Amino acid sequence: MANRKYFGTDGVRGKVGAYPITPDFALKLGWAAGKVLASQGSKMVLIGKDTRISGYMLESALEAGLAAAGLSAAFTGPMPTPAIAYLTRTFRAEAGIVISASHNPYYDNGIKFFSAKGTKLPDEIEEAIEAMLEQPMDCVESAELGKASRINDAAGRYIEFCKGTFPAHLGLEGYKIVVDCANGATYHIAPNVLRELGAEVIEIGTDPNGLNINEKCGATDVTALQAKVVETKADVGLAYDGDGDRIMMVDHLGNKVDGDQILFIIAREALRSGQLKGGVVGTLMSNMSLEIALKMLGVPFLRANVGDRYVLEKMVENDWTLGGENSGHIIIADKNTTGDGIVASLAVLAAMAQHKLSLNELASAVKLFPQVLINVRFAGGENPLESDAVKSVAAEVEKRLEGKGRILLRKSGTEPLIRVMVECQDAELAQQCAEEIAEAVKKIN
């Protein structure tokens, strides 16, 4: 990826009111994107958002910029990120825009784009938009200005899409499901999908007020969900994040089931039904137990860098259709073009219904190895991971862990931190090894 000023791996993101998440920048970004897309023959762009209060401000500014460049905008209102990927395709729009900062707190927001195919914009288009941002803003002739409209049935369309991914011969009658929508974009989608498939649904995190998105709820904090599942004697709990592209689950005993376990359940079911194409892509942070469990099934496994963008890249590279992260981003490429929390959760529920097994039973094949993560701050300058002393300690630890665990040493891309991760079946050994490496890193300081 070329050096970017604004676009990161997941669009433009930051604190609301601080550049670039300001109304004037959103206006200019809408105009710049409009100019570039119009030059490709575009006429209409979809705009969706999550439930943050700043979404109103940003969607209005983006729409004004697009209109000035001659493009019309269609608003969907609060809608999960994967819904915008899907709706952009089905509405034959030239692009889709999502206003969201995913799992971040309400005071952050972001703007990202989808292509007409519902995939991330090609790098060259993002680079052209960045270049256009440096140009003075102008306005097309009045007769050529874009218009704004609202899509009133966007939620209903996406609900039907989600239900369509669930096997027609199965239903969720008899299941009691607690769903936590993080007070985010799935609040009016997920409960309806589950009810229409026959489940009894108990809702938490479905009362957004613009400020409570991801606050002690959703995929990043399942504590309330665990308590509610146990209290109501539910069969399963589902937790989505603020923009609906992540899923975490809770079994009937209140145990958290993470993205690695969810990925395994979906992979095994796809293998059984003959629908698994190739292998599975995880990340550098995927638990070693996932790799071992897949190996026992004869399923190839590859690790990508952390980030759903990199998972998807490796899937495309290998022509595989399944990948994900332990954080709950699960991409089932033959169903949607991006991580889709609702679709992934339905795939797991279908496996439960098909085999009449509990989530606890399905997840038991992946007994997660303890992971010890230590962040070591350093003074900047030389990267401690390049030091011979650190390399020597790391090599000695790797030898000790051979066959039983692994280490991962990463320099943070945003802070002067070295992240030391040790994973091992033996929790004490993992802790000891992580501390040894962390100590070696500290000495370099």
Swiss-Prot record:
One of its GO terms (biological process) is UDP-N-acetylglucosamine biosynthetic process. This is Phosphoglucosamine mutase. Catalyzes the conversion of glucosamine-6-phosphate to glucosamine-1-phosphate. PROSITE patterns: PGM_PMM (PS00710). GO terms for cellular component: cytosol. Disulfide bonds: none annotated. Mg(2+) binds at residues 102, 241, 243, 245. The keyword Magnesium applies. SUPFAM superfamilies: Phosphoglucomutase, C-terminal domain, Phosphoglucomutase, first 3 domains. The keyword Aminoacyl-tRNA synthetase does not apply. Belongs to the phosphohexose mutase family. GO terms for molecular function: magnesium ion binding; phosphoglucosamine mutase activity; phosphomannomutase activity. Pfam families: PGM_PMM_I, PGM_PMM_II, PGM_PMM_III, PGM_PMM_IV. Keywords: Isomerase, Magnesium, Metal-binding, Phosphoprotein. Binds 1 Mg(2+) ion per subunit. It comes from Haemophilus influenzae (strain ATCC 51907 / DSM 11121 / KW20 / Rd). The lineage of its organism: Bacteria, Pseudomonadati, Pseudomonadota, Gammaproteobacteria, Pasteurellales. It catalyses: alpha-D-glucosamine 1-phosphate = D-glucosamine 6-phosphate. The modification Phosphoserine is found at residue 102. Its EC number is 5.4.2.10. Activated by phosphorylation. Its cofactor is Mg(2+). The gene is glmM1. InterPro entries: A-D-PHexomutase_a/b/a-I, A-D-PHexomutase_a/b/a-I/II/III, A-D-PHexomutase_a/b/a-II, A-D-PHexomutase_a/b/a-III, A-D-PHexomutase_C, A-D-PHexomutase_C_sf, A-D-PHexomutase_CS, Alpha-D-phosphohexomutase_SF. The active site is at residue 102.
